Amino acid sequence: MANNKSSKKRVEIAERNRLQNKAYKSSMRTLMKRCFSACEAYNATPGDEAKTSVQASMNAAFSKIDKAVKRGVLHRNAGAHQKARLSVAVKKAIDPAPASAS
């Protein structure tokens, strides 16, 4: 346990920041899940409206991830990893791989 006043204050600040970061990560994960579910919905029923939904959800998730990296909630490599996961899912949904020529 903290002994002096400054260390007690740092404990309080660290706890406050932990809760704020937790909430930010949670909202980021929610946006990512929305993007993945939009990709699944597009696969089920392709259309212009579904494609727009996929693009919009991806843009929102990318924005949230970039802001998390900027705020120090996520490491930049972790942010890049999450954005790559989203990009792969969206690319698979919108531009499915053509059948092999062999």
Swiss-Prot record:
Q: Which Pfam families match?
A: Ribosomal_S20p
Q: Which domain of life is it from?
A: Bacteria
One Gene Ontology cellular component annotation held by this UniProt entry: small ribosomal subunit
For this UniProt record, the keywords arranged alphabetically read as follows: Ribonucleoprotein, Ribosomal protein, RNA-binding, rRNA-binding
Tell me, what is one Gene Ontology molecular-function annotation carried by this entry? structural constituent of ribosome
Show the InterPro entries listed in the entry. Ribosomal_bS20 (IPR002583), Ribosomal_bS20_sf (IPR036510)
Enumerate the Gene Ontology biological process terms: translation
Q: Which family does it belong to?
A: Belongs to the bacterial ribosomal protein bS20 family.
Annotated function: Binds directly to 16S ribosomal RNA.
PANTHER family assigned: 30S RIBOSOMAL PROTEIN S20 (PTHR33398), SMALL RIBOSOMAL SUBUNIT PROTEIN BS20C (PTHR33398:SF1)
Name of the featured protein: Small ribosomal subunit protein bS20
Gene for this chain: rpsT
